[in-house]
């Protein structure tokens, strides 16, 4: 019914054919005005397509070998602006992980009551990257060689998210 649903179906077919990485996009969440009216439609489309995609992979036995990551480059302000929108907010936002080695129905970390600050288990992009790699069986502490020079696969100062992978 929607482009995202068709793209999820194509992604599943690509994964079935052996493609190892697929990226989907669902854009236009940058709602500085009319946030609520727009998101009623936008989130309904995402919710149906995403939940169907996850169920589809699980039904085919592919979820245990597929990592699904849903994220944005920043969050939205906890408060509504003058135009009934939400602006950019970099201090706290959510990431959804599903599939290989990810616990089902698990909430990791917390924000304060206003959603403005992380108060428990704050992580950064380095932690996420290590976690992604480890979840698909790549040793995130290993190196790879570029023209005779060893380079770390991931930031050596970072590590996977403690207690997340099962």
Report the location of each language-model feature.
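Ligand-binding pockets and gating/stacking loops
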Residues: 1-166
